[in-house]
Amino acid sequence: MSAAGTGKKVFIKTFGCQMNEYDSDKMADVLRAAEGYEPTTDVEQADLILFNTCSVREKAQEKVFSDLGRVKHLKARGVKIGVGGCVASQEGAALIERAPYVDVVFGPQTLHRLPEMLARRDAQQRPQVDISFPEIEKFDHLPPARVDGATAFVSIMEGCSKYCSYCVVPYTRGEEVSRPFDDVLTEVASLADQGVKEVTLLGQNVNGYRGRMGDTAEIADFALLLEYVAEIPGIARIRYTTSHPNEFSQRLIDVYARVPQLVNHLHLPVQHGSDRILSAMKRGYTSLEYKSSIRKLRAIRPDISLSTDFIVGFPGETDDDHARTMKLIEDVGFDHSFSFIYSARPGTPAAALHDDAPRELKLARLQQVQEAIEANGRRIGQSRVGTVQRILVEGPSRRPELNAGHELMGRTECNRIVNFAGPARLTGQLIDVTITEAYPHSLRGEVLLRERSPQPA
């Protein structure tokens, strides 16, 4: 039953990963359907303020409490405040003790209960906390998504069962639970019917997907799911994130040869180049095994773009360990990375490890990692100049100085942003552009005129 037209507004601030972005969209959908809330980007106009949090790094966690303090004054006019996501899951009722003006605390698996929690808050006149792990229940209680554009996220699983020594995800999101195979396909088909051309399949470890097929006992793995998603009419591109190298199997690699909709880009977190550190992280593979997987993939897709994650300054990291990370970067040729200094998370095994490396050394190592990968990115970007790239046009350029000139932006298969001049009617379309310039984090192109088309690269 729709509750549209109430005039109530919700402000949602999202921290962290794409899973959180997806969850924030679902919070908005749930609140719109149940209570008529409409999203706002102006916190001062909100009747409800939600922070969807991340606890992967200490800085992100502390920023949540800083932001809470900044909106506390809005309670005077009856605004409700909620905290969801991984910090909420980790802190639970302790969050209320630290910020007693918070009305609701909910975990990633209980966001669908938001309307009920808010109602109980009013009825009982006390804060509500629900950070339970009701497996995949939330997907059965979410209203249909409202599509805005030609791209969409689709969550295919929740949680992680890898228990890396530094990571809180298994404790904040629970162990791996896969959505039923048919449920995922139904959602993707619905999105395609609404004009979506590109889907990004989400999970903490998507290649660990094991979804039940219909009413049978059969289980679909991630490779099979990709093949079925590719058969859905209208889906031109498939992305996924995040993966774990342990389950980047030959069966999954072979899908790249059979499914052209699978984009020419892979994000595969390696975290470190030293086998000694990888073992301490409990990652379960060696740098050689990681490179072997990449070599097999490049035998099928020679020009695939690769991005990754690196943790610098893990307890006990030596100069030799760091040198091995730099060698891995050189050997693999990553296009992009998310690189951070290690941040001890309470309750994880790594938090008990002795860490005596000075922060200045860690910062220097981080800079070396980032500079090496940025150099790779610049080289790869320059190599695209003069080539033809197919891009999916997402909308106006995000660079303010270009918007006055009616600039648009889109992404290549390799996830490079391309800015170009063109009419707004191209939004949502797949078009060919000739790349004319390369910048550190984007490309510039011209819409290809068919009558004078160069050969695609």
From Swiss-Prot:
Superkingdom, natural source: Bacteria
Name the record gives this protein: tRNA-2-methylthio-N(6)-dimethylallyladenosine synthase
Domain MTTase N-terminal, first and last residues per copy: 8-123
Cofactor binding remark: Binds 2 [4Fe-4S] clusters. One cluster is coordinated with 3 cysteines and an exchangeable S-adenosyl-L-methionine.
Function noted in UniProt: Catalyzes the methylthiolation of N6-(dimethylallyl)adenosine (i(6)A), leading to the formation of 2-methylthio-N6-(dimethylallyl)adenosine (ms(2)i(6)A) at position 37 in tRNAs that read codons beginning with uridine.
Record organism: Methylibium petroleiphilum (strain ATCC BAA-1232 / LMG 22953 / PM1)
Protein encoded by which gene: miaB
Places the protein is found: Cytoplasm
Keywords for the protein's UniProt record, in alphabetical order: 4Fe-4S, Cytoplasm, Iron, Iron-sulfur, Metal-binding, S-adenosyl-L-methionine, Transferase, tRNA processing
Taxonomy of the source species: Bacteria, Pseudomonadati, Pseudomonadota, Betaproteobacteria, Burkholderiales
